[in-house]
Amino acid sequence: MNCNETMLERILSFAREDERIRVVTLEGSRTNRNVPRDEFQDYDVTFLVTKMEPFINDEGWLDRFGTIVMMQKPEAMELFPAVVPGYSFLMILDDYTKVDLTLRKVDELDVYLKEDKLVQVLLDKDGRIKDNIIPTDEDYHITKPTARSFDDCCNEFWFVSTYVVKGLCRREILFAIDHLNNVLRPELLRMISWKVGTEKGFTFSLGKNYKYLDKHIPKALWERLLSTYNMASYEDMWRALTTCQDLFRDVSKEVAEYFRYEYPDYDR
């Protein structure tokens, strides 16, 4: 993979030469001082430009960054449409480096800078950015639940548990797995994250998809959670569901006690 300095210099060298590019920023994990550095980190870069169309209509300029072996352009896709503003080129290079390069109009600079605080300014040709921007991941910190959000989490978990049971009773294992993984599990992880917050504070992030969760919970809790990912049979699914419910009940009672919230009777 390209070393950090080599790839960034390649990006900045191109940006300095092209008058249409006025501002260049780096986003994501490479700007986050709380994330361990490794060779697998993407380069999330945004070019704020005077005109986007020339870059979109002629993609030859992308070769400046390396040999592209695969690319996605979300704005050009039908099955997986873009969910963020701008126009993006998500590239995997032949040395396995991944570069996510997004084009935004420079007129949208103020709006863009308000969208995410995890941004580092690499180039500002016109001095448009007056404030000193320091990247921070505070937008991704664990958030304290309100009484309403706590109850909503409990309600969603226990209500959809009945769907998992229905799927298992009908011998529709894919239906049951889908509801456990895509509804119950996110609420269980959310509740566990609140537990972490009550114990260690709400001043840090557990990472995308809770990837740092294991560093902040007891080994026994972590192993119980991991056991719920074994869903290869109906017996395994019943066991996973029961364990998820036991975990959720235990953790949500702790969270309710900490915040002095009423513990709902949804699991009666």
Range-by-range predicted roles:
Residues 1-19, 27-38, 46-102:
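Metal-dependent nucleotidyltransferase catalytic core
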Residues 33, 108-110, 220:
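A broad, structure-centric signal for solvent-exposed, well-ordered loop/edge residues
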Residues 37-38, 113-115, 206:
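Short aromatic-enriched loop/helix-cap "lid" or pocket-rim segments at secondary-structure transitions
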Residues 38, 120, 211:
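Flexible, active-site-adjacent loop/turn segments at secondary-structure boundaries
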Residues 65-175, 180:
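Conserved NTP/Mg2+-binding pocket subregion across the NTase superfamily
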Residues 141-268:
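Conserved nucleotidyltransferase catalytic core and NTase-mimicking acidic/glycine-rich helix/loop elements
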